[in-house]
């Protein structure tokens, strides 16, 4: 929850902040690009570290680090200082996902991991739901031009309380890997070569790049699209952003429940995940309609369905990654996250440049919703059948 609060504070106030700091749309895109690139390298670093260091200690450490950077963002004065803060935030925030996936892998069985991962991802949405309400509260009571600064600091302080609560409530030795699953894999020193030779890995490379591109671009640019592209007020855009992340939460939980339900009805675990992913990808494609709708209730309703789809694909993706490796789970998820972020982050810069040149968000928004379909195609072409997997 807290990692998305830190992340969404900026995008929710992006119109106000870019105006006050006199940033172009491309510069705002550069800030998101820098965040994503730092997140990529952080994913790689913490992905390797989580296989060596206890999650019980690593998790609160990275959260304290990104909370401190989030707090410092409330003091930025120009483009360069904002850029620096987002770089450090991206790097340390990346430690969340390798740690979280080790936790869900330890707690849930193979069949229940899609639902467990949906709970994990939905927590991020809860943070994103709360953030616009906090921001609106500050704007309601203060008309000061600097009213955008305290929300960064409040969210940063919340992270400190979470870290202490974690250390107090989680016993030492928690979240060790399941022995029976550890024995099923060889501890080959050539694990990286084996990974590169694995068709399933390359299917997931395409998938993570595609879903990260659509989710992150819409997340970062939605407030600007609503305010600058469709003429909504800042207040309405903030309230809708909360509603949007309610929809993403529903999509995320719904995806996990659907995959688990299909498994109980007799579908294979893999087929259940793939069907769920495909349905969510179809919802994401609704950007092709939303991008060309005028201001009005229909636009907002379609965007809610887009949100449900673009986040609903993630529990399926996380469950696929957990089938690649147990002994090297942190490293594998870290590598995939690195590739997903390093490839998708530059899109923000070019999207911003396009908006500067055309004064329109429409075409870019329409195209980005199609991206998750590429992940589905890659899975169908590259992921081996169940019988082949058993023989590997």
Role assignments for model-derived ranges:
Residues 10-11, 198-255, 314, 318, ...:
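Extracytoplasmic gate region of multi-pass secondary transporters
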Residues 85-124:
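Cytoplasmic helix-loop-helix junction between adjacent transmembrane helices
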Residues 173-205, 229:
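Juxtamembrane intracellular "pre-TM" segments in multi-pass secondary transporters
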Residues 22, 54, 75-81, 231, ...:
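Helix-breaking motifs and short loop linkers at transmembrane-helix boundaries and internal kinks
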Residues 57-71, 271-288:
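Structural signature of the two symmetry-related core transmembrane helices
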Residues 41-79:
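Conserved MFS/SLC helix-loop-helix module at the cytosolic interface between two early adjacent transmembrane helices
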């Amino acid at each position: 929850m807290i990692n998305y609060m830190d992340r969404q504070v900026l995008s929710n106030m992006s119109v106000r902040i870019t105006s006050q700091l006199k940033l172009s749309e491309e510069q705002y895109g550069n800030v998101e690009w820098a965040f994503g690139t730092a997140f990529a390298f952080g994913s790689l670093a913490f992905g390797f570290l989580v296989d060596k260091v206890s999650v019980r200690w690593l998790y609160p450490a990275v959260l304290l680090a990104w909370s401190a950077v989030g707090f410092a963002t409330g003091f930025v004065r120009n483009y360069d200082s904002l850029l620096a803060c987002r770089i450090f935030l991206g790097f340390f925030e990346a430690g969340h996902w390798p740690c979280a996936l080790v936790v869900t892998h330890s707690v849930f069985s193979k069949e229940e991991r899609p639902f467990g991962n949906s709970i994990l991802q939905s927590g991020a949405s809860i943070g994103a739901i709360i953030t616009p309400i906090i921001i609106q509260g500050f704007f309601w009571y203060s008309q000061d031009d600097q009213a955008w600064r305290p929300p960064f600091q409040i969210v940063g302080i919340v992270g400190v309380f979470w870290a202490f609560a974690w250390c107090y409530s989680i016993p030492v030795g928690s979240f060790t890997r399941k022995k029976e699953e550890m024995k099923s894999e060889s501890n080959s020193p050539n694990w990286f070569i084996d990974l590169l030779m694995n068709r399933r890995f390359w299917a997931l490379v395409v998938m993570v790049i595609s879903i990260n591109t659509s989710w992150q671009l819409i997340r970062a640019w939605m407030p600007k699209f609503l305010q600058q592209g469709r003429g909504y007020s800042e207040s309405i855009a903030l309230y809708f952003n909360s509603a949007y992340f309610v929809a993403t939460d529903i999509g995320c939980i719904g995806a996990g429940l659907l995959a688990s339900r299909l498994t109980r009805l007799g579908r294979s675990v893999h087929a259940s995940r793939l069907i769920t992913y495909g349905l969510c990808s179809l919802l994401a494609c609704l950007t092709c309609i939303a991008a060309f709708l005028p201001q009005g209730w229909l636009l907002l309703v379609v965007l809610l369905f887009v949100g449900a789809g673009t986040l609903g694909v993630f529990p399926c993706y996380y469950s696929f990654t957990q089938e690649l490796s147990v002994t090297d789970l942190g490293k594998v998820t870290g590598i995939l996250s690195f590739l997903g972020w390093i490839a998708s982050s530059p899109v923000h810069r070019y999207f911003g440049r396009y908006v500067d040149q055309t004064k329109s968000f429409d075409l870019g928004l329409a195209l980005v919703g199609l991206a998750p379909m590429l992940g589905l195609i890659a899975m169908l072409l590259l992921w081996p059948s169940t019988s082949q997997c058993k023989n590997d």
